[in-house]
Every structure is written in C-alpha cells, then in structure tokens.
Amino acid sequence: MLILGIESSCDETGVGIIELSDNGHMEIRADVVASSMEQHARFGGVVPEIASRAHLEAMPQVMKAALEEAGVEKPDAVAATVGPGLAGALLVGASAAKAFASAWGVPFYGVNHLGGHVAVANLEGEELPHSVALLVSGGHTQLLEVEAVGKPMKELGTTLDDAAGEAYDKVSRLLGLGYPGGPVIDKLAAQGKPTIDLPRGLSKAEDLRGPNRHNFSFSGLKTAVARHVEKAEREGTTVQVEDLCASFQEAVADVLTAKAVRACQDTGAKVLLLGGGVAANSRLRALAAKRCESAGIELRVPRFKLCTDNGVMIAAVAAQLIHEGAEPSGLACGTDTQLEVEVPLVAAR
C-alpha cells in the first residue's frame, strides 16, 4: 500500500510517499521538499502570507516530482498536516491533499504535524517504545511523552516564551548573521569557546521542583546576549562573535538536554527522541548523547533530512494509523492552528 503525505505547516512544501507492507514495515519511496526560506530571509523570519503563496506555487511541481521519484501514478491513500501550524499554510496543503484524494478516489487522513516528527523514528530502526520526544524548531519547543507512534501524546513541558529555534533566529539577527540563525550560529560556535556566562531559563532549584520542572524559557537568554552586545558597543570593545555564539549555543543545549533527560527519568522512559529542525544542531546532539549515556537512556536522532519538516513524516504517521485500522478523516476534515498533541488523527465529521 502506498501512502502519500503532504507537509505545509510552515515554510517547507513537502511531499513524501511511503510503501506500507502487510506486516507494518515502512519503506520510503519518495521524499521531495521545496523551501521558501530564501524568500523570508530579508524579513528575518517566516512571513505567513509569503509562506502560503510559496506553497501554492511549489505544490504542483513537488507533487509531480514525488510521484516520478516513486514511479507511481497515484497512491492508495493521501495524508496531510492539518495542525498545528500557520493558518494559510495549513490550508494550502490540506486543500491540495483533499483535492488529489478526491480526484484519485482514495481516502484522506488529516494528521498532527508533531506526531509526524515522532513517527520518523519508526523509519530509522526498531519500533519506538515508550519514550520522551524533545521537539525543537522555530515554532515549537516541547517535551512529549509518547506511548507509541500514532497514539495520543502527553505534553510534559513547553516554552513559556520563545521557541529555541526562534531564539536562534533572533540572536542571529542581533549579531547581523542573517536568517535562519541555526546553521550559522552552529558553524561559528565551533570556532569559539563558551566562556561567556549566560543564563539558563527555568533551571533554578525552585523551578525544578515546581510546575515549570519541564518547561523552557529563552527570552532571558536572548536579552542577556543583547545586553552583552550593548555593553561592548558602549565600551568600544569588539564582540567576540564566535565565543558569544558558542556560549549561547551551550546555554540552549544545556537546558534542553538536562530537562529532556529529567523528563525521561520522571516518566520511566528509556528512550529519548530528538525531532525538529534544531535537532540537527551539533552541540545539542553531542550533549544529548553524553547525558543519555550517563543516565542509561537510549538516544534516537533521525538523519538530518528527516529532522526538518517533510512529507515523509506525515505519510509515516498516517501509515501507522492505517496499519492499526484507523478510519479516514474524510474530505470535511478542517485545519486547526492549535491542534493538541493528544489528537494524532482528526476524526471524520
């Protein structure tokens, strides 16, 4: 059975095709992604209207390329991200998916974007057991308890202000490094040393005992970087950009990995899964590996291409649901910018 997945929650237009065997095994047949990142760069972040228009323009070509890559004329089912995400962007992808499903006469499944980031774990090795997922991107920073792929997830913690990826972009803009901030800061950090003392949000003893035990905050860190730059300007000194990037990156990775490992210990999960665009960050991966090894926790990190938004992850979560006998969502299925993590599949109306 062939399942085609469409992802359009932010600035990537992704179409992926997965072949689902009767025993539940999944094989990637196509993975095509078009990004509108360059169009957003001049604005220093994603502009929703530009993202929506870019999806409209890219969808026909991306769809054609995916079908050609898989060597098929049509799939047996179509799935799309219906939330969470940007309203216009979600609407483009979901509408396209439903139109293709209707034209091909195949069922439509409306799935959760965050569930997709978790589902790619089943494509990388053994089936994901009870675990904690740390999903980190420009729009999300969440700790989720996962019983299994395709099942309702439980939010353990989230950011109370900026997402980690958003903090990277803002700091990059502050330092004049451009957009997106993640790759350039990661590169410069490798050339510097984390010698600048920067705050770790919600990491004090009282925070770790209270309701913010698993929550994050990056606004204070961002402000501290800004003050460091302002102080250098006042004093006429040179900002050591490489050291500042290394210090900022260390602070982010420190908090993310410490809280992720603690969440595993609190829930009894023996696996930590990293997902989202920031999961491609070299320091986050290295520190997560070190701390997981010390704590006796298995770390799973998707290959770089599957960390960022893509259609394969949407096809993967739909494939798991189909294998378990889930009913299609139907063409009346709507989108929800704030879709809860407890909803892996939007039910038929």
From Swiss-Prot:
Belongs to the KAE1 / TsaD family. Gene3D superfamilies: 3.30.420.40. Required for the formation of a threonylcarbamoyl group on adenosine at position 37 (t(6)A37) in tRNAs that read codons beginning with adenine. Is involved in the transfer of the threonylcarbamoyl moiety of threonylcarbamoyl-AMP (TC-AMP) to the N6 group of A37, together with TsaE and TsaB. TsaD likely plays a direct catalytic role in this reaction. One of its GO terms (molecular function) is N(6)-L-threonylcarbamoyladenine synthase activity. Its EC number is 2.3.1.234. One of its GO terms (biological process) is tRNA threonylcarbamoyladenosine modification. The gene is tsaD. It is found in: Cytoplasm. This is tRNA N6-adenosine threonylcarbamoyltransferase. Substrate binds at L135, V136, S137, G138, G139, D169, G182, D186, N281.
